[in-house]
């Protein structure tokens, strides 16, 4: 899908003005009530009071979530005019803006329109600028148009014919902006497109079946990103992982015939003296639970257990496309967690790269076992900050559901930066406790720590486990178990937390 901007003179609406633009659909936002303003007023004047009459007659009221499509409107060059309800102007916030975009996309999807002049983005909520509006619009429109089957021909249905849901008709969107916002809007198109691309990569990797998206596939994806954007990439195999004494990571890999991979992808957008931000993503490409086997029902969704890895790769790709002036490193430990005659058993004790010993009481608590060695490895980069991303605990879903990502951090400053980025990108997180008292639950009679701490505060104790390996740098942990994918009729990867991470990095680069 192609996005561009067009600077328009709103004072010249009719003949030779923006309303004369030839396009399949003109998209205009209308606030609830009869006091028209902005583009809606210009449209009303050019159409001799059409919008006002519709409001007065009650055919369209401008309420949130509503829309009305008009065809062949006199005085308008577009084949269709789509009126989108914005709700009450006093209540127009980020969520109302997003709802208007989604409403417009749904309405357009029921037509054969392939192009649109989009007059919603120049009307952002208070305290938001044109850049935010453009990035948000592109992300939401692209999100609605995502189709895995079209992006991966090898997954097409046997008859070779896509279903109705696989058809995306909207191909070109021109975002109308004020002339004095043109420069900022153009930059925002680049950034919005990069973020959408990163989200789509993340969703692709998550949605692909685990017989395709293996650890080797993830490594090859990282190599492809590096080649396309001229980045540095290093992929360590089993022998190199063994040489680094990553005993915790290796313990998880023992049951699978798929070779483990340890991926390091570097984006150097600033000088060598700038300490990098490191993103660490959990890459379990399929999680059976190992010897502590999961129930069969719903196990197919454990292909999503690598969404942390997918999100950091998607984020790094987005950063490279945007050309941000900062240094970012993505680190991905990736393997399968499988049962077999040589798999790690409950009660086994292993030595991590840090030298700390771990009693593995439950082989299904494997994400923390691969992450802890990665978190030790990244000390060599002397990072400015480290953020790990993982579908780590079902307990986080119990605590927060599917709305907020769980956020853990020692530093209030780092936590606030991530929370603010989440609010701005509408990819929200909620800060969880990391008190030292929870560490007592990880005590072991046979090792420095156990890999589980019992049922109480399961997401917290998982974060406390990771905290033991992050004392040499500023660190945060994002538990995305509830936000990385959806189940049911809308089943599929969400692309989160790419918007949060990219906004966090854009803010640091500003």
UniProtKB/Swiss-Prot annotation:
Keywords: Aminopeptidase, Cytoplasm, Hydrolase, Manganese, Metal-binding, Protease. SUPFAM superfamilies: Macro domain-like, Zn-dependent exopeptidases. GO terms for molecular function: manganese ion binding; metalloaminopeptidase activity. Mn(2+) 1 binds at residues 287, 364, 366. InterPro entries: Leucine_aapep/pepB, Macro_dom-like, Peptidase_M17_C, Peptidase_M17_leu_NH2_pept, Peptidase_M17_N. GO terms for biological process: proteolysis. The active site is at residues 294, 368. Binds 2 manganese ions per subunit. Mn(2+) 2 binds at residues 282, 287, 305, 366. Presumably involved in the processing and regular turnover of intracellular proteins. Catalyzes the removal of unsubstituted N-terminal amino acids from various peptides. This is Probable cytosol aminopeptidase. It comes from Cupriavidus pinatubonensis (strain JMP 134 / LMG 1197). The lineage of its organism: Bacteria, Pseudomonadati, Pseudomonadota, Betaproteobacteria, Burkholderiales. The gene is pepA.
